[in-house]
């Protein structure tokens, strides 16, 4: 569906959790193989940082409690000037077929403008990695920092992500 929209000239920007900010490493392990197709269609990709800046901290921290790490759990699509889909529904096979989650479609320019501003702020270099492909090599850039492998919270998370990739579980994610 995204490829069709791109072929019609629609700009598509995706904000997804980075390896470091995802709460289900198994999901990330199977998402990674779709990056080349996203790049091939000209889709812009951003991965939310597990160590975000002021915007992320403001949204996550509830004084006096400060989050040790922050993950992205937002499920929203902003389409055009006034349509927003938001809810608990993951956009995957399992959620659509098995889970009993919900979503709303809201048609309001004011709401869409607010959501767009929020998501744009979450895509800033302080909050997210801009993921690009240069000569077939994926790069994560955020401000002056550029990395050649997915930013993770720990070596254990990297090993877990590798092991999950070996399991035939994609249809269950």
Predicted regions and their residues:
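PLD/PLD-like phosphodiesterase catalytic module centered on the HKD motif
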Residues: 1-173
